[in-house]
Amino acid sequence: MGGRSRNCGLAVALLAMVSVPVMAQTCTTQAKMASDTRTALANEALLLGSAVKAGDANAVKAATVAEYASNFAPIEHAVDTTSEKLKGDTLRVTQVYLLDASTRKAGDTSDTEFTCPLKDTTSETDFSFSSLPPGVYGFAMVEAAGGDRSWLLSFLLLQQGSGWKMAGFYPHPRTAVGKDGLWYWTAARANVKAKMPWLAWVQYDEANELLRPASFVSSTDLDKLLAEQRAGAPPALSDGISVQTPLVVKGTGVQEFHFTAIANEQAGDGGSLHLVLHYAAEPLAGAEPNRVRDAAAAEAMIKAHPELRQGYGTVIVFADMPGQNPSVLSLPMTEIR
């Protein structure tokens, strides 16, 4: 869904996207990797995952590259909040990749892409970075499962001497309300066939969020998912939805709302889903006028596309205003006429 990312990626400025020439580098999958390298990457990832699960931010900091260890507060916050979600989970390293960018020149701002064909299939996993410093990197995925919720802890690792240091941490849930990404993908397909494209759009996006290890990682399957989402999109969303391409929905009278994002959000207890709406707005004087306008925005969206009522107990509306924090309204779906 345009304009939204739940991924807590913390590596960096070095991943910012720019429109410049692309440089291809070398990727080695775990099936073709030297056993000692594969073991070293997996061991480091498991140590980091165990430290995150234990809430041991000091151990994570000690294993982090100096650039991010010196400004560790965002990573420490991610460690603290993620560790709370992993109680009762067992950690297992499921995938490691070796990404060799050692031939890049220092200061090179071109894009760097790694194409990783998977053994005995026609599928591949791809990585795309920009302004990636020269070096040898590893990407490791640690699955956390067995507790109340499944999570994925992905780590970008940089080889330093004979060891590895963390250069990026990307935790995110693998399920929403007890359902995994494949479930949401299947549900989206069914709703396209059932002529409910708006609900399908949100479900495709949820599937993408749950299945994608990090924002800079793609795969043959994820490309297929996004192609299906585009093919089944309502005409109003054919160009996506974002600040640049808002969805305009009429309210009462001459009122209209410019929505910039439609998303799912799991409730804190993991037991239900919220429908999350963002729209562009100008500041109003006082809390009550903002609340009334936010409620009107939610009502306009649900009235225009009533299928979005399905599966959601609450609508959370963000009125994004220039130069200040958004106003936020949480509205039970039962209160929306």
Residue spans for each PLM region:
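N-terminal secretory signal peptides that target proteins for export/translocation
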Residues: 1-7
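Short beta-strand edge/turn micro-motifs at domain boundaries
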Residues: 25, 113, 134-178, 256-286, ...
